[in-house]
């Protein structure tokens, strides 16, 4: 990492991780949590969640960017998904997706490959989809996050 990137990582660890403040990264914000991304070259991320952000390599006929509604398959309990049921739909707009995040993956969707939809590690959460564009399901995710922030921020 170069100086400015180290500063960002250090500040993230100081302000969010160490203090236990809830953090929600949406779309690119989630992608920044990983070790590295290959979007427009190879770039180091914050390294908070192991894994990489890679371009889609999809079967013929599937379009990139992935834009549209997909159902969420919840893999494990996660406070961010407190008001969400398995199979509810969320809205995606992206050309890259996270892979290799293992135990930190809370929910996935299917788009030619399993797409990590929600990650969670401690007080840090991320969604690849856009909750603000995901109707009632998205509002319920934002409601759960809002509840986590009460008295903390």
Residue ranges with predicted function:
Residues 35-113:
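Pocket-forming structural segment of enzyme catalytic cores
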Residues 27, 94, 130:
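Histidine-centered divalent metal-coordination motifs
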Residues 114-120:
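Short, surface-exposed beta-strand/loop micro-motifs that present aromatic residues
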Residues 127-153:
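Acyltransferase
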């Amino acid at each position: 990492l170069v100086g400015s990137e180290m500063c960002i990582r250090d500040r993230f660890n100081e302000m969010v991780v160490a203090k236990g403040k809830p953090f929600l990264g949406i779309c690119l914000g989630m992608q920044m949590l990983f070790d590295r991304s290959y979007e427009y070259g190879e770039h180091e991320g914050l390294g908070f969640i192991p894994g990489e952000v890679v371009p889609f390599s999809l079967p013929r006929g599937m379009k990139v960017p992935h834009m549209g509604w997909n159902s969420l398959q919840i893999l494990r309990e996660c406070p961010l998904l407190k008001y969400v049921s398995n199979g509810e739909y969320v809205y995606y707009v992206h050309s890259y997706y996270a892979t290799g995040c293992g135990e930190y993956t809370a929910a996935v969707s299917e788009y030619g490959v399993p797409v990590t939809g929600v990650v969670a590690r401690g007080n840090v959460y991320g969604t690849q989809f856009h909750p603000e564009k995901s109707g009632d399901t998205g509002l319920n995710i934002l409601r759960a996050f809002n509840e986590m922030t009460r008295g903390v921020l």
